[in-house]
Amino acid sequence: IIIWAIKKYAANFRDFLEIGCGTGFVLQAINKNFPGNNLFGDEYFEEGLAHAKKRLPEASFRCLDAIQMQDQARYDAIGAFDVIEHIEDDKLVLLRCFQALKKDGFLFLTVPQHMWLWSSFDEYSCHVRRYSSLELMQKVEQAGFQVVTSSSFISLLVPLMWLSRRRLSQKKEESMTELKLSSWLNIFFMMVMKVEIMLLKLGAKFPIGGSLILVAKKL
């Protein structure tokens, strides 16, 4: 869904920064779909950054807390994928992104959605919050952006997610069950995602979903 959004709204970018790039998995996919562009990755944890550098040696990486970013009008597009829910001062990070983007640059965000899906999984994952669509849009607009589009995803699986999370105890080891999908469940999940992406391409928007994607523009 991330690649689809970038192709739709910022296919002609030259400089792309991913905040909280982890081990570089998403940047690698971006590099595959948009070869020849300049890719940058910021990551707070050095261990993940080491893996990212091995995975994508042609990209530029920094060990950096997103709040400390001081770039000015440097990037055509910035992505933060399941990142800002971990940060207390998410408003400041969004402002940093606004400052770092060139005029007419795009911001791509994915976040976990709906506090009523909160469970021990979120606590184990060190989430500060799960967003509502309205909350995320308001914070993005307060940073100076214009929201271009927003939609829930992982929507077809919400009933299963809700049942699963109601059954989770507060035990850390049980929370890990959501992080370890069996191979057949992973295949099923990918099939559902393909269906949702197809529907999004046709113009559908989902009102609820386990996650939320938002695209915004710096005018």
Where are each of the predicted segments found?
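Conserved N-terminal segment of class I S-adenosyl-L-methionine
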Residues: 1-81, 91-94, 179, 183, ...
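A C-terminal cap/extension of S-adenosyl-L-methionine-dependent methyltransferases
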Residues: 71, 157-219
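A structural helix-start
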Residues: 87-91, 111
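Short, glycine-/aromatic-enriched active-site segment of Class I SAM-dependent methyltransferases
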Residues: 107-129, 133-138
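Residues lining the SAM
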Residues: 81-84, 110
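Conserved S-adenosyl-L-methionine
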Residues: 145-155
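A short glycine-rich, Lys/Arg-flanked "PGG" loop and its adjoining helix->strand segment in the class I
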Residues: 92-106
